[in-house]
Amino acid sequence: MIHIYTDASSKDTTMYPGGVLRTTKVGIIVRNSNIIDVWFKRKEKFISSHEAEKQAILYSVAYVRSEYETNDITVHTDEKHLMQCKSIKKLIASGIRVEYVKGHCPGRKELKYKFNCLADWISRNGINTWRNYYYRHLLPQ
C-alpha cells in the first residue's frame, strides 16, 4: 500500500512591496515508512486554498497511479470539507481511500513532522532538504 500525505498553500501578498501570487501543492509518497517519491507543483498564480488542496490530492493520486501502477492508495489530508467534493467522491468510488487527519499538516503524527505547512516549508527549502531532514531526524532509528 502507498500512502500520500498532501498539503497545499495559497498566498497573495501583492499588497506588499515585492509581494507574490503563489500556489504550492505537494504530495509526499510513502511506502513502508519510507519516502519513495515526492509530487510537487508551484505556480505563480493564486487559487483558493480549497481548490489547491483538492488539486494536490487529485494530481498526487494520478501521479502515483501512472508511476507505480497501483490503485492501493490511501491519501491523508487535513481538509475535512473536501470529502463532499464530487471529484473526491469519484476518487473514493474508484477504490482510493481518503482519510481526514485532524489538525495541520497531514502526516505530522505519522511522519513525526513538526512544521505547520509542509507545502510552504518545501517551497522555501526545497524537496531534497526536506527529504534529507526526514531521513536524518524524523525516521525512528
Model-derived segments and their meaning:
Residues 1-51, 62-63:
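RNase H-like nuclease fold core
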Residues 9-23, 43, 58-120, 131-140:
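RNase H catalytic domain
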Residues 52, 56:
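Loop-to-helix element that buttresses phosphate recognition and phosphoryl-transfer chemistry
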Residues 127:
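Residue-centric detector for conserved, function-critical "anchor" positions
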